[in-house]
Amino acid sequence: MNRRDFIKTALAAAAGGALTGGLRFSGARAAEAASTGGGGKKKVLIITGSPRAHGNSNTLADEFTRGARETGHEVVRFDAGLKNVRPCTACNHCGMQGPCILDDDDFPFVREHIATAQAVLFVSPVYYYTISAQIKAVIDRFYAINGTVHARKRSAFILTLANSDMERVQPIIDYFRKGLYDYLGWEYAGHVVGTGLWPVGAVNGSRFMDEAYRLGRNI
């Protein structure tokens, strides 16, 4: 599938995906979904997208990390919201698998570790009912390592938002499950959607902390 076909597939999934099982797999059932087929120790790359170092989504990433490490997994983390990752300029210099003219920023860390990771976790706050610009910039830069990321991997995602309307979150769930994962050939390993989280620290003591922890244990 070329770049244009991928974009069309992802947009179609985001815009028109039916409200199916993905909605029901948020929260506690995410850990159950992740428990199937996830045996063995793994290298897990976490990519977060919040510009707030101690925001709610990053706190859930911490809990996921705790669960994963307690199970014996190696965890490597890239906080895109606190790094310098420039957006893809569509120059095609890389030819979908090669040197990127922007690789003097922080993206080479992702390039290095995603090649050897058996699992990837995406963590993002929801801004205007989509993922953050910071994490989207990382995903778009996958174009330069398109062959590398087309490999057998498990992947999960964590989303946080102030609203509690799950129907509005479904297009993001579809983007990951029906768009990105289908294109890359990655195995879906579960997700957590933390709703009703507005101020920093709102997630502390919530059920989402345990759900993120168990997702990490079962990645």
Predicted segments, located by residue:
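Short, glycine-/small-residue-rich phosphate/pyrophosphate-handling segment
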Residues: 150-188
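Glycine-rich phosphate/pyrophosphate-binding loop and the adjoining helix
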Residues: 180-219
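Short, solvent-exposed coil/turn elements at secondary-structure transition points
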Residues: 81-83, 161, 194-197
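Residues within the helices of the helix-turn-helix
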Residues: 4
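N-terminal beta1-alpha1-beta2 submodule of the flavodoxin-like/Rossmannoid cofactor-binding fold
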Residues: 7, 11-123, 129-145, 204-219
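Short histidine/acidic/glycine/proline-rich micro-motifs that form metal-
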Residues: 51-54, 126-129, 162-166, 197-200
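Hydrophobic/aromatic beta-strand patches that form the interior of the parallel beta-sheet core
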Residues: 45-47, 76-78, 156-159, 189-192
